[in-house]
Curated annotation (Swiss-Prot):
Protein known as: Regulator of ribonuclease activity A
Encoding gene per record: rraA
GO terms of molecular function: endoribonuclease inhibitor activity; enzyme binding
Any GO BP: regulation of RNA metabolic process
Annotated GO CC locations: cytoplasm
Origin superkingdom: Bacteria
């Protein structure tokens, strides 16, 4: 499904939070949305693999990577796993790598930067907790919508018809 965050803000501005502009688009899908699952991890992506093995229809993985620009939390293998399990998208307060490969996958990916260095694999982090970045607190099961213009958050699904 296509989402237009500008139009959604025109209709629902009093009901949504707008995340501070900081993200770049890396996936093959330019807009996406769904109910969020949160992960908080720093320079370690083993937990992401575990979460992304779950069915992802209608879901977006929101990753609080502490804004790290030193190690990529998302690489081509993790993004492919998300695509295979039908996740709608990934929003990463952190970095990605293998950007040419990410562009070929049918998934939306928003992150703050790219870097060629991969993440650790220790499995350190938390799932389904409240996280805060970009001027917004994200709660598990909130709904998020993203496109090339921006990212918005709503406690309820937005009617886009």
């Amino acid at each position: 499904m296509e989402y237009n965050t500008s139009e959604l803000c025109d209709i629902y501005l009093d009901q949504v939070d707008v995340i501070e502009p900081m993200f770049n688009s890396y996936g093959g899908r330019s807009s996406f949305g769904g109910q969020i699952t949160t992960v908080k991890c720093f320079e370690d992506n083993a937990l992401l693999r575990t979460v992304l093995q779950q069915p992802g229809v209608g879901r977006v993985l929101l990753v609080d990577g502490g804004g790290s620009l030193r190690r990529a939390l998302i690489d081509a293998d993790i993004a492919l796993l998300a695509t295979e399990n039908e996740w709608e998208g990934l929003i990463v307060y952190g970095s990605v790598r293998n950007v040419d490969d990410l562009d070929e996958l049918e998934i939306g990916i928003q992150a703050i930067a790219s870097i060629p260095v991969g993440a650790d694999q220790q499995g350190v982090g938390d799932v389904d907790i409240a996280v805060n970045f970009g001027g917004v607190t994200f709660l598990p099961e909130d709904h998020i919508y993203a496109d090339n213009t921006g990212v918005i958050l709503s406690p309820e699904p937005l009617d886009i018809e």
